[in-house]
Design a protein with these regions (language model features):
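ABC family nucleotide-binding domain
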Residues: 1-166
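Conserved switch/coupling elements of ABC/ABC-like ATPase nucleotide-binding domains
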Residues: 168-172
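A short, basic/flexible loop-to-alpha-helix module at the beginning of a structural domain
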Residues: 176
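Glycine-rich Rossmann-fold phosphate-binding loop(s) that bind the pyrophosphate
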Residues: 182
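Hydrophobic/small residue at the entry helix of a nucleotide-binding pocket
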Residues: 185
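N-terminal Rossmann-like dinucleotide-binding module
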Residues: 188
Length: 188
């Protein structure tokens, strides 16, 4: 996941993202890729606890240089998309786990990344909320986003178009599923 997210550079082989060899890029270029082309969704949400949902979602746009007058409008759009239009002014510690994860998903989308990396995004939430998160990911995938997700939950992995099982750093099973609408990387 760290290599896919351009957080680590591969020591062998080639990683090409949007026609660029990642291992040949400068630190500044890698930071730019992480900010603009990749959306990250973490198991622990990584929200600022005393900051509103709206401001948490606006934060990546500040780093990307999006004009301040546009940030709020864009953040509101994505919070409404994940069903939190009525919770925008709540701080993250006033939100349920599922709501916090939806804020994290909205935050990952505000710069319209082509790749979304989700590390155990349903691991800390109730099963009903996990299904809501998977529905959001399916919708995003249908809109053209590539979703790579790590999960240990087989019922969550069943939402995938493809499941890759990795054990001890090696692929031991690669299964394509033709019914669903999401690409997932699983770890077993």
């Amino acid at each position: 996941m760290h290599i896919l997210g351009a957080l680590d550079i591969p020591t062998s082989g080639t990683y090409i993202l949007d026609e660029e060899e990642v291992q040949k890029l400068s630190d500044d270029d890698l930071a730019d890729i992480r900010n603009k082309k990749i959306g990250f969704v973490f198991q622990a949400f990584n929200l600022l606890p005393r900051t509103t949902a709206l401001k948490n979602v606006m934060l990546p746009m500040a780093y990307a240089g999006v004009p301040s007058e546009e940030r709020e409008e864009i953040a509101k759009k994505y919070l409404q998309m994940v069903g939190l239009g009525d919770r925008m002014e709540h701080t993250s510690n006033q939100l349920s786990g599922g709501q916090q994860q939806r804020v994290a998903i909205a935050r990952s989308l505000v710069l319209n990344p082509s790749l979304i990396l989700a590390d155990e995004p349903t691991g800390n939430i109730a099963s009903a909320q996990a299904e809501e998160i998977m529905d959001i990911f399916k919708k995003l995938n249908k809109e053209g986003h590539t979703i790579v997700m790590i999960t240990h939950e087989s019922d969550i992995a069943e939402h995938a178009k493809r499941i890759i099982h990795i054990k001890d750093g090696k692929v031991f099973k690669d299964k394509k599923i033709t019914v669903m609408g999401l690409g997932i990387l699983g770890r077993g």
